[in-house]
Amino acid sequence: MPTVSQPKNLGDLLKYEAPNLYSRDQDTVAAAQNLSLGTVVGRETATAKLKVIDPSATDGTEIAVGVLGNDVDATLIDREDAILIARHAIVARGALVWPTGLTVAQKATAVAQLTALGVLVRDSA
């Protein structure tokens, strides 16, 4: 019997959000990145644009500000159509996308930063 493999969708990531899109912001992802739904992101202080979280950075991207709610290909230009899950939400731990090489402690720090914003990370089926 053939199997079907489907890409992740918002339902795999977002388990609860506040009514009237309160949990979501439309935001800008900085160029030179191709980010997937579920990517944990930080905000570069100088540009106010989103980038993948980088705990070793000192430009603001070391602090988690939310989780992407859609795929964003900003390889060539800044993309202003990113959906940021920024507050009052529950996301599935297994659907989060982390940069390679992050330690367990760095992930725990980022999860704590998300929790402080009201974005709870839970184990989910």
Predicted segments with their positions:
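Surface-exposed, low-hydrophobicity beta-strand/loop segments enriched in small/polar/acidic residues
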Residues: 1-125
